[in-house]
Design a protein with these regions (language model features):
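Short catalytic helix/loop segments, enriched in acidic residues and glycine
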Residues: 20-35
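Conserved beta-strand segments of alpha/beta enzyme cores
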Residues: 24, 74-76, 208-210
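Conserved core of the sugar-phosphate nucleotidyltransferase
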Residues: 113-189
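N-terminal nucleotide-binding beta1-loop-alpha1 segment
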Residues: 1-19
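Conserved alpha/beta core of the MobA/IspD/sugar-nucleotide pyrophosphorylase nucleotidyltransferase superfamily
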Residues: 1, 165-241
Length: 241
């Protein structure tokens, strides 16, 4: 099992915080978002990581060297040299194309209850983490699931018909990787600005996908300053136990 952490984006909605560092290196309590996610993974015996680099890659590489000395982990890097013209479908494609093992895919700005990671890893098949508890809005990356198949995925889905929100954390079973990579190739060819999340819509029609529902376990994705403030609150709660 390896964990891919997507750290290539520019984080424009958090400027000026992200002017000199990418979002995953933003710190709360002297610990970066990326390190906090790695700690969650290490707690579940995931010790191998692939970090996708892009915006301010030198800062991420510097942090990686520090983390490799601090924890018993292995870290590979993949550079998305076209990070400013592409999106997560391209970044994930770069990271997964040579893998032959189960892999988690994690947005680099995720802050989550560690039980989300540990419970996801108990599922042996390809699986997505879906928040079925949070109040949805127009910005939520929603899914509509019927008979275990993703009928729709994206922000434009009717809130009333949505099954929940995809939180940006998933796991691809190694046997599904060839098909997953093929779908990613098609997404990138269609539009390099596509999100990798869209690959699961097609994959769900041809492979068995499980859905881990958060059932109230807390998380956030740090997209803007409101999220950043909420992340501070969450981490305070997590650290207090």
């Amino acid at each position: 099992m390896k964990a891919i952490i997507l750290a290539a984006g520019t984080g424009t909605r958090l400027m000026p915080l992200t002017k000199d560092i990418p979002k995953p290196l933003l710190e709360i309590g002297d610990i970066s978002l990326m390190e906090r996610m790695m700690i969650n993974c290490i707690s579940s015996n995931v010790n191998e990581f692939i970090i996708v680099l892009g915006h301010k890659k030198e800062r991420v590489i510097e942090k990686i060297e520090y983390l490799k000395k601090k924890y018993p982990i292995k870290i590979e890097t993949v550079e998305n040299k076209m990070y400013s013209q592409t999106n997560t479908s391209f970044s994930v494609k770069l990271a997964t194309q040579k893998l032959d093992d189960d892999v988690m895919i994690i947005n680099g700005d995720n802050v989550v209850d560690e039980r989300i990671i540990s419970d996801l890893l108990k599922i042996k098949e390809t699986a997505l983490v879906v928040d079925n508890h949070k109040h949805l809005n127009e910005e939520s990356f929603k899914l509509r699931i019927e008979d275990n198949i993703i009928m729709e995925i994206g922000k434009g889905i009717d809130i009333e018909t949505a099954s929940g929100e995809f939180i940006g954390i998933s796991k691809v079973f190694k046997d599904d990787l060839p098909l997953f990579n093929s779908i990613l190739d098609e997404l990138v060819a269609e539009d390099a600005q596509n999100y990798y999340d869209l690959a699961y819509k097609e994959l769900s029609k041809k492979a068995k996908i499980r859905y881990f529902y958060t059932n109230g376990l807390k998380w956030t994705e740090v997209d803007d300053k409101k999220d950043w403030l909420y992340a501070h609150t969450l981490i305070g709660e997590f650290d207090d136990g």
